[in-house]
Amino acid sequence: HVSEAFSEDPVRILRVARFSAKLCDFRIAEETMALMTLMVENGEADALVPERIWAEVSRGFASRHPLNMIDALSRCGFPVDPDNSAMREVLSKAVSEDLCLDARFALMTAFCRNAEEAQQTAANLRTPVALQQLCSCFRTLLPLFAEAVDAQTAGALLERGDALRRPERMALMIRMWEVLSQKNVEKLLKASELWCGVNAGAVAKAQTNPRLIPAAVRAARIEALQPLFAASEKAGNHGHDGSQ
């Protein structure tokens, strides 16, 4: 329950929702929810300073029950998330796997209907630029994650994901894919290490034509992945031969 003074500061909408994420038994009184809804409908939430929005929402996403916060904000009309049961299951899994705040949020936006909706969701909650980039990158990589079954396709994934310059972010996205797909990703994590471990300088020195260096370095990285995927490729070929 709250007093009439509650409506004087719209950040309290977010704070109440955050409490529901932090405290499992926290319940929002119907009168309070009605007041929160009225404040959103009257446009009072539009005046919130961006930093204050994310300060509250981020703490809720990092809590043990972020879905409770999402539900509370959705009930009062504050634009938050795609209404998707699969998203709820994945976000719960991300919490149980103790994935970080950024991973949880990016996984939620992966269920938006399109890139524009995902961008709007991030904008509504005033997310930092780095997190918006993570959301966009992960969404773009989803088809490549699904196709990464051999050295060539895994290499394409790591290349597009900028594993060389952003190895920590790549590892995080691989873990996010594990939660989303429920597949074992240890091979992809190892592939990322091998990809980044190639001595590009040594490969470049061995080339007499400078224009061939980029292709040679990429080929060396693909070659480094071959042994990792060789066993599964061989098993797949045997299965194909036996079906003829």
Residue ranges, per PLM feature:
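Glycine- and charge-enriched loop/helix tracts that form the active or gating conduit
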Residues: 1-123
